[in-house]
Curated annotation (Swiss-Prot):
Active site: H10, E88
Signal peptide: none
EC number, as in UniProt: 5.4.2.11
Catalysed reactions listed for this entry: (2R)-2-phosphoglycerate = (2R)-3-phosphoglycerate
Species of the source: Methylorubrum extorquens (strain PA1) (Methylobacterium extorquens)
Pathways involved: Carbohydrate degradation; glycolysis; pyruvate from D-glyceraldehyde 3-phosphate: step 3/5
Gene that encodes the chain: gpmA
Name used for this protein in its record: 2,3-bisphosphoglycerate-dependent phosphoglycerate mutase
Amino acid sequence: MERLLVLARHGQSEWNLKKLFTGWRDPELTELGIDEARRAGRWLKSQGTQFDVAFTSNLRRAQHTCSLILEEMGQGGLETIRNEALNERDYGDLSGLNKDDARERWGDAQVHEWRRSYDVPPPGGESLKDTAARVLPYYIQTILPRVMSGERVLVAAHGNSLRALVMVLDGMTTKTIASLEIATGIPLVYRLKADTTVESKTVLDKDIDQDD
């Protein structure tokens, strides 16, 4: 039985380009972000991948990425389930601020702690621990059972909601997860064992040109 789980961070958004803290704000993808999502779909198709169901957040950049991936794979009508449990981390008072401006206001060390620590939230926002507290129950109760039943599952979401999943899947600690970066538009392909642990993991090489 194949137990396939593919995680994909959304393509570059307009606020990624402007270096703004995004969180639950809802910007669109840039042209590059659209290209990244389409490229991810082409790569997955080239690997012979097909999905039975897709999950995404309530935010447009993840939904658009999900639809573009599926469109490139010829699966545009696939069942797609949206849930705010997969939303990006809420950056609270940082939302909408330029990252350099935030550093000037609060200092490099404080902003770095808010961004990269596991359990220190920005004012009015969520820490990665808080994000994991909503992502992981949804994964365990809703997504994982479908993977374990043999369905091939795509999750198109966000850097921090996916970091919460990768921390569990890859057995990372709260310290090692701090340095993990998940690139926009790069699928992480997991195959799981019967005990739900990881059998294999494949990552799209950013340097591969899928148009060749």
